[in-house]
Amino acid sequence: MYAFVLSFCLFFILFVDEMKITKKIIVYVFLIIIGIWGMQQRITYITLILPIVLLIFDKTGLAKNKKLCNIILHSAMWLPIILFILGITGKFNILAMDSYVKEGYVSNSAGKMTEDTRTFLYEEALSSAVNNQYLIWGRTPAYGMDSPFVQSFDDAGYVGMALTIKGKMPQRICEAFIPNIITWCGILGFLIFFLLFYKFSYRIINKSNNIKLRILGLYMTFFWIGSFITYPSTSISSDWIIVYLTIAISSSPQIMKLNDKEFALLIRKATT
């Protein structure tokens, strides 16, 4: 629940200057509450980094530099794919932080910050795709990936963790978007989502007529990076709502043509 509200608060903080004082107070109060009681998962800390970076771009005027924004766009879109290839080839696994971070960081609420909880998800997703011959096309959202991890829990008596049962191997979905999309839609689906994020991020950054929309374009590129470790898309998520809201905005020629003052007026009317 905290994470759901946090994403909306961090989204609205980008437009807080255009809001009336009462709406500003509401956003700040929610942020304070979440900061005190809601920091219970590592992804929450990661989620906080994104709006801070975007706010810096907004307040310092860096977002006005279209060339810099395009460099960030292309780097952010290709970096996780490069790291993904390095990981599956065994050359470098960025998720195994203990291998290159000498001292493990421990949070009272989130536990060990360097613990790798994602590598085995990719191992299960890829091995299931290869073994069942659906690596290219996927096996549709009606199925999950074959999971020896869930099998071990079922063998120990924890029944009901699997999404479905096909044969003897339990299947499941996971808390990261990319392993799920590989399972459901294969490499083809992965490429489609890559192009979706690439197209709309590029469109917003290069075709919009105001800075706030350009920042939303940068938001989508960072969301693409985050989809490799979270954003499962298996339930209603504030993060996905914001992404599709951004896509809808970029699909509106009228909104894309608004200058900074006109867009600020639109936000003020929308939050009245």
List the model feature ranges, each with a label:
Residues 109-185:
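Long extracytoplasmic/lumenal interhelical loops at the membrane interface
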Residues 1-105, 167-271:
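Hydrophobic transmembrane helix bundles of membrane-integrated enzymes that assemble
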